[in-house]
Amino acid sequence: MGYGSKDIKNIVKEILEEKKDIGGIKNIYFVGGSLGALYPAKTFVERESQVLRSAWINSNEFVHSTPKDFGENSIICLACHKGNTPETIKAARLGKEKGAAVIILTWLEESEIIEFGDYIIHYTFDASPDHLAGDIDYAGEKTQCALLVAVELVAQTEGYANYDKFYEALGMISNIIRNARTHVAARAEAFAEEYQND
């Protein structure tokens, strides 16, 4: 079964409930080839949690240099756009083998990686020919989904003082991005024309 960004609160709640009798969740690993998209989530946990350990690791490095504390008290949140990156598939498989809760962020409905996920979250993506249509829900794109996992994990394990403000801001992000795109469109086109051969 696939999930969307609006399901993340319940996904985290379910994971915490499943893991409570074995000591709960102690750490979360953000893993993938799309590391840039995962950085805000890793940083959020590092800055806002007093009890959770967080790391941000390339898929291949994670497989070949797995952290010692990775196991049944872990969440691994993987980003794999088309679900076919061999190293990320191996990292997801390792998560299953170690008993971690495996969350996969992906765009495609069907792919190789989904068999290794406990929760498959399909994020929004602008699939228009030039990726510039801008008609997606930006609150549901990959970076936001990873951040939602982080925010919900911290909030549900130890509380997060700015939780309501976070969701208020998340509700504004699509309009902010659309307005910004309109505002800079002419300047962006002029810049591209001027520097296209540099």
Task: Please state what every model-predicted region is.
Residues 1-198:
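Conserved N-terminal alpha-helical segment that immediately precedes and caps sugar-phosphate-binding
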